[in-house]
Amino acid sequence: TLFNRLTGANVLSKDMLFATLDPTMRGMFLPSGRQIVLADTVGFISALPTELVEAFKSTLEEVVQADLILHVHDMSSDLCSEEASDVSAVLDDIGIDEQSRDDHLLHIFNKADIADKAVDIPFIQTGLNGRTIKCSALSGSGVDDLLNQIDEYFAQRDADCQIIINPEHAAASAWLHQNANIVESRYNAEGQHIIRARLSPANKARFHKHWPDIKARNT
């Protein structure tokens, strides 16, 4: 439901085992205009039969590669804390250790509209790494704050870079205009394209992978 609310998609959302077997990905824009890809993975469960464990983990490749992990907690569940522990155990199993979770995890406490008003969540948050936010995917309450937090996360990690591109690498210029926040764009007397841009760590790595001879130097 939260995935649909954020992306405007109409993906199957049911409280049942393996309602979605494969990750679903959709592009979306954050309040700043930054474009990201949001991936919705198969739900995490405990006591999974041994013969299904590896198949289950193989669907979580997007989690390992993600710049930011959104851990959605069901505030209305009596087992919210236990379910959070199950997710943490799976993250450990697929190689996302506690240090990585400190840097790349946002805890979203969903269903705030139907959670028992007599039950608060500080005890659940105690010991959890990362950032936290409370919202309701159904009513939309808190969703704007969530989007702003995601936006702020990426903005804080961006690097301000200067890239000098020779004429024969016009594709690199086009890629930057699609994947970076362009601050300045000009040409020098030699016909080189000089771009000042803000790049996320992931996009900076992707740029170097495609064009290893072009340096994106921090300014």
What is the predicted role of each segment?
Residues 1-68, 73:
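Conserved G1/Walker A P-loop phosphate-binding module
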Residues 13-15, 30, 35-39, 47-50, ...:
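Extended hydrophobic-aromatic, low-complexity segments
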Residues 1-8, 78, 89-219:
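C-terminal-of-GTPase-core extension/linker across diverse P-loop GTPases
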Residues 24, 50-63, 72-95, 99, ...:
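Conserved catalytic-core segment of NTP-binding enzymes
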Residues 17-18, 36, 74, 84, ...:
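Residue-level detector of alpha-helical recognition elements and their boundaries
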Residues 23-27, 34, 42, 59-65, ...:
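Short, surface-exposed, charged/polar-biased interaction segments
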